[in-house]
Every structure is written in structure tokens, then in C-alpha cells.
Curated annotation (Swiss-Prot):
Domain characteristics, as noted in the entry: The N-terminal domain is essential for RNAP assembly and basal transcription, whereas the C-terminal domain is involved in interaction with transcriptional regulators and with upstream promoter elements.
Subunit architecture: Homodimer. The RNAP catalytic core consists of 2 alpha, 1 beta, 1 beta' and 1 omega subunit. When a sigma factor is associated with the core the holoenzyme is formed, which can initiate transcription.
Region (Alpha C-terminal domain (alpha-CTD)): 248-329
Function description: DNA-dependent RNA polymerase catalyzes the transcription of DNA into RNA using the four ribonucleoside triphosphates as substrates.
EC annotation from Swiss-Prot or TrEMBL: 2.7.7.6
Swiss-Prot/TrEMBL catalytic activity: RNA(n) + a ribonucleoside 5'-triphosphate = RNA(n+1) + diphosphate
Gene: rpoA
This protein's UniProt keywords: DNA-directed RNA polymerase, Nucleotidyltransferase, Transcription, Transferase
Protein name as it appears in the record: DNA-directed RNA polymerase subunit alpha
Length: 329
């Protein structure tokens, strides 16, 4: 297959291999030589850093004032609990944030399944362990989940918080990306007689909140939108061409019939070879009154119709009629 030098092969989605519920391999081919690494690296960076998702941003635990402490009856310290909460895979529908609550008592593990939430919130990993209780102890907490993009450290959020932030409200480093791991591999591909093509294999692990195929589609859309600016690229030093203004107002080039005058007035104008509005506005009141069968009533009608369009009788138009109309007259 030998095409034009300006034509490039377009890849197509060939296969999606679901390795496990959160991991999949997506294969795209054929790609022109070198495009496997070009597109693979670009998609990888977007998938890791620019995909929107949901993450825990704040936590309040009853009886806890700061993260460098522990809670009686809980096996993990507070820092470990916050780290475990960062592993929650949450989907929020129809809004940008949600408040979750958790209350548990009695010895044993505390998991994401123990969290109470609204119907527009879905927790994709209910078996995720948050902490372990010992003895006949309990734990209660409120968890704020927000939609966002990229990675936002707690220190950055603290700078924007008011100084009156309640003691005990713990800020969490938030990784909003639903993609936990992404790697790509470029293999050889063949189309007919061409053997120098690329096959792109993307190995993706997510937190279960997004389908791998949808993740590829979203990342490709983001990349395409950013590249649109280069498609429309223009030399900034190139002087912009000024649009030439029309010699006459377009309304002057329209036939007098567009004024929707009475039959009597319209016939009088046609008898005087007044075919266009530009012809009409150059006439004076005295000239029109000399027109047979055109009286003051018709004159008043014509003046009112012209005034409604910002025109009047007695206007002077240089170079009238234009060449486009002169041939028709």
C-alpha cells in the first residue's frame, strides 16, 4: 500500500483486554512509524495528570484535634487513617461535592461499606479498609469528597482556607485522577506490504470509577482540543487584512418592493424608473410630488417607511448606481 506523502494512516481501536476489574490493556493500530511513542507519551501524561475525578479533601474525626495524634481503641494512628481514606474510589453524580458520614462500633475492621452517603454518590471499592477497632470502641467521622483534577496538596488548600477553619478539620492531599497507573509499549505492526508501522499498547490501571475505553476517549479529546490552537496558528507579525466596507449600505441595494408600500405608491415609483431604495432616497419631496398620481398621502407614507429604516429623502449617494446594479438598469 503506497499512498500520498501527505496522507497518514489513522489508528483504530483494535482490542480491549480486561485483565481485572481495574486494569485493562488497550491496543491501537496501525500508526505511522514514530507516532506510537508520540501519541503514547502524550496520552500517558494526560491520563495521569489531567483526568477529572473525585477525591477526599477534608475529614473530621470525633475526638481528634490534629493529624499527629491517635484515637483510643483504633489500631491505626490518624495519619494512617487519612492515608487509607485517600484510597476511596468515589463517583459523584450531578454535583461537585458531597459529605459522607461514618459511624462504627465494636471490634473489627472499618471499611468503605460502613460509610453512609446520598443516592448520588457511589463507592466503587466498598471492601476498602479504613481502620480497625479494638475492644468495644467506636469511631465517627465526616468525610468531604469533591470533584477536581490533578493533584492538590493539603498545604495548597490550607493557603486558601479562612483563618477561622475549625480545629479538628483535617485537610487531605487529594489525587483526583481516576488513573492509578499507566504504561505504554510500542510494537511492530503491518498493513499489507508496509512493515514499518507502530502498534500502541496502553496498560492502564484505574480506581474503578472510569472505563478504560472512556478514559482513552476523554484523554484524546483533551489532546485534540489543545492542538486546535496550532491548527489555527497564524504568524502574529502578519498584518491583519482589513475587511473592506461595502461602498453602499446593503439596504440601498434592495428593490423598493421590499418597502411594502401601497399598490398606488409602488406603481407611481416604478413609472418613474425608481427600482431600488438607493434610487428613491436621492429624490426630494418636490421631485416626488411632481410624479403623476403621487399625492401628499403617498409621500407621507414613503417618508415614514424610510424613516423606520434610518433613511430619508434627499440623500446624496456618490458613485450611484454601483456597477452591480448599473447593468440591470
Amino acid at each position: 500500500m503506497q499512498g500520498s506523502v501527505t496522507e497518514f494512516l489513522k489508528p483504530r481501536l483494535v482490542d480491549i483486554e480486561q485483565v481485572n476489574p481495574t486494569r485493562a490493556k488497550v491496543t491501537l493500530e496501525p500508526l505511522e512509524r514514530g507516532f506510537g511513542h508520540t501519541l503514547g507519551n502524550a496520552l500517558r501524561r494526560i491520563l495521569l495528570s489531567s483526568m477529572p475525578g473525585c477525591a477526599v479533601t477534608e475529614v473530621e474525626i470525633d475526638g481528634v484535634l490534629h493529624e499527629y495524634s491517635s484515637k483510643e481503641g483504633v489500631q491505626e494512628d490518624i495519619l494512617e487513617i487519612l492515608l487509607n481514606l485517600k484510597g476511596l474510589a468515589v463517583v459523584i453524580e450531578g454535583k461537585d461535592e458531597a459529605m459522607l458520614t461514618l459511624s462504627k462500633s465494636g471490634a473489627g475492621p472499618v471499611t468503605a461499606a460502613d460509610i453512609t452517603h446520598d443516592g448520588d454518590v457511589t463507592i466503587m471499592n466498598p471492601d476498602h479498609v479504613i481502620c480497625h477497632l479494638t475492644g468495644n470502641n467506636d469511631i465517627s467521622m465526616r468525610i468531604r469528597v469533591e470533584r477536581g483534577r490533578g493533584y492538590v496538596p493539603a498545604s495548597a488548600r490550607a493557603q486558601t482556607e479562612d483563618d477561622d477553619r475549625p480545629i479538628g478539620r483535617l485537610l487531605v492531599d487529594s489525587s483526583f485522577s481516576p488513573v492509578a497507573r499507566i504504561a505504554y509499549n510500542v510494537e511492530a505492526a503491518r498493513v499489507e506490504q508496509r512493515t514499518d508501522l507502530d502498534k500502541l499498547v496502553i496498560d492502564m490501571t484505574t480506581n474503578g470509577t472510569i472505563d478504560p475505553e472512556e478514559a482513552i476517549r476523554r484523554s484524546a479529546t483533551i489532546l485534540a482540543e489543545q492542538l486546535d490552537a496550532f491548527v489555527e496558528l497564524r504568524d502574529v507579525t502578519e498584518p491583519e487584512q482589513k475587511e473592506e466596507k461595502p461602498e453602499f449600505d446593503p439596504i440601498l441595494l434592495r428593490p423598493v418592493d421590499d418597502l411594502e408600500l401601497t399598490v398606488r405608491s409602488a406603481n407611481c415609483l416604478k413609472a418613474e424608473a425608481i427600482h431600488y431604495i438607493g434610487d428613491l432616497v436621492q429624490r426630494t419631496e418636490v421631485e416626488l410630488l411632481k410624479t403623476p398620481n403621487l399625492g401628499k398621502k403617498s409621500l407621507t407614507e414613503i417618508k415614514d417607511v424610510l424613516a423606520s429604516r434610518g433613511l430619508s429623502l434627499g440623500m446624496r449617494l456618490e458613485n450611484w448606481p454601483p456597477a452591480s446594479l448599473a447593468d440591470d438598469l
